Amino acid sequence: MSFREVLIVGWQYLRAFVLIYLCLLTGNAISSLLPIIIPGSIIGMLILFVLLAFQLIPAHWAKPGCSLLLKNMTLLFLPIGVGVMNYYDQLSQQIIPIVFSCLISTAIVMIIVAYSSHYVHRERPIVGSTSEINNEQQKQEKQEK
């Protein structure tokens, strides 16, 4: 790999992380101005989504940074898991309600996803197809009899 290629790849990662970080900073700034409590990271994610959805910025600008973060997502959850252990006493007292709510919410999500997937992927008639025309002709013949 030549020095030029290293610089190009480095620039692509730098541009992606700067873009993601600018969206985060903008989201934090907007969050501090709002009268309701919405995390700045959520607002920043929505800003990044809008920028990409309306193609205000090309998707390949954010792709290198996003793919790197997604590859290492499990590693990024490690500090959160360690931080939760600071509240071990409180968690151990409430373990049954926590496990129960996790199981119920997981079941609800699975049911909703199943019905949504079934609805989205159902078989739809093709408008103007020969089978549709034949069905309409058969209905008309039955009505005439």
Swiss-Prot record:
Recorded GO CC terms: plasma membrane
Pfam families found in the cross-reference section: LrgA
Bilayer-spanning residue ranges: 6-26, 34-54, 65-85, 95-115
Compartments in which it is found: Cell inner membrane
Topology of this chain in the membrane: Multi-pass membrane protein
Keywords annotated in UniProt: Cell inner membrane, Cell membrane, Membrane, Transmembrane, Transmembrane helix
Protein name as catalogued: UPF0299 membrane protein plu1549
Organism: Photorhabdus laumondii subsp. laumondii (strain DSM 15139 / CIP 105565 / TT01) (Photorhabdus luminescens subsp. laumondii)
